[in-house]
Every structure is written in C-alpha cells, then in structure tokens.
Amino acid sequence: MIKLERSKVVVRDGKEVIEAAAIAKPGDVLLEVVTYTNNSKSTVRRLEATLPVPAETELLVDSVAPGSAFASVDGKIFAAMPLKRKVRSANGAEVEQLVPASAYRSLRWYPGDLASGKSLTFSARFKVSDDQPAANGKSR
C-alpha cells in the first residue's frame, strides 16, 4: 500500500507548525510524505520508492529525507543529487553545471527489501512557485 500525504509548513510564533494544505499560495512550503507499507505475507524485493515533485513547485533539496534520494528531470532517468549536466560554455568548452532544483520532477529511493508487515516513509518539502499557485493543495 502506498499512502501520500500533503501538508503545509507554516511558522507561528517562531515555531514550525504542520497544518492541512487545503489552500496553497505562492511562497508556501508544502511537506509531502509517502509511506510504503507491505501488507502481503512475503517480502517486497528491491523496492523503488518514488515521490513526484508537485507541479508549480520547487524542491527544497535540503529537506529530502532520507537524504539518499536520487532525482530526475524527466521522471525516467534518476541520478544521485545534486543533479549535474554538461553544457557548452561561451568559448565552446564542455563544462559540468548543477541542474537547478526547479528542474527536478521526481525523487526516488532504493531502500532494498521491505519485509512483510513493515513500512518505510520518505519525505520532502516543496515551495509553491511565485508565478502560479497550486490551488487547493493539489498539483497540476
């Protein structure tokens, strides 16, 4: 079973508070938590836990937990974070450049096996983009 929960992170009186994400507006920080539970009688082998980056948001890279996540810009090819790409500089040389977190579209963890009756939880925070809000806390 896979359970995805989305909340909003707000600061009240200097303390972080997690609340329902009924409405999210530009600048808000969303917390997404995905829990994988093995309800079968056998071990799930080679689990791949995936958490898509919600549309109109940017991943807050330091919030990824556990920190062993891989990321993707297309949801198909995953690599260790931070993602890098090769680009041509003004003088024609090929240089390696960090991919901005705004380009990340999906996260994936490879925790190995998940025993019967056990659960694993993965999470990350995302900032709602300033150009378009995610209405009602739902991704587009």
Regions found by a protein language model. Name each.
Residues 1-140:
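Exported/extracytosolic protein signature
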